[in-house]
A protein has these predicted regions:
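Bacterial N-terminal signal peptides
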Residues: 5-14
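Short, low-complexity N-terminal intrinsically disordered segments enriched in polar/charged residues
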Residues: 17-47, 51-55
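Short, surface-exposed loop/helix-turn segments at secondary-structure junctions
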Residues: 117-123
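A solvent-exposed, acidic/Ser-Thr-rich amphipathic alpha-helical stretch
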Residues: 46-112
Length: 160
């Protein structure tokens, strides 16, 4: 009798876990991470960006890969002395075919302008680039983290 009750309790727990995962909105949770990345990157918040990745997460851009949170953090912090950036995220497509995993593609338009002490808006001639982020996500305990991100450039602005 005790074995039967334990079996029923275990079955109820497993069904509850399965239902919880099926009702989890991967698109909403992982889209939020995509937007958070853009904002934190523009603020040169290296720790904030690094925390959006798994411990062993990777970010690849222009043939260079940064692996692990520390490397990702240092890449962002290195931009503190560079130009001002704005990453504008538009189209986001997130799909999950396996519990705990998701894939996504998002479009990004990047504007770059010179850093200045002025409070006036920065003048730019056009976007610096338009591309796609190809992401693999891991979802654990309701939190979506980037396992890998690759930037694929599509258009660049050419000064004439």
């Amino acid at each position: 009798m005790l074995l039967r009750l334990l079996s029923i309790a275990l079955l109820g727990f497993l069904v509850g876990c399965q239902q919880q995962d099926q009702s989890f909105d991967y698109s909403e949770a992982c889209s939020s991470v995509v937007h958070d990345y853009a904002y934190l990157r523009d603020q040169t918040d290296g720790q904030g960006v690094a925390n959006l990745f798994t411990d062993e997460g990777s970010f690849s851009i222009f043939g260079e890969t940064f692996s692990g949170r520390q490397a990702i953090k240092q890449r962002v912090l290195g931009a503190e002395v560079g130009p001002v950036t704005r990453h504008l995220i538009s189209t986001i497509d997130i799909e999950s075919k396996t519990p705990g995993k998701a894939r996504g593609v998002s479009y990004v338009t990047v504007y770059i302008g010179p850093r200045s002490d002025s409070t006036n808006p920065i003048e730019v001639e056009g976007f610096a680039g338009i591309g796609e982020y190809h992401d693999r996500f891991v979802v654990d305990a309701g939190e979506c983290l980037i396992e890998s991100r690759e930037f694929i450039p599509v258009f660049t602005y050419q000064d004439k």
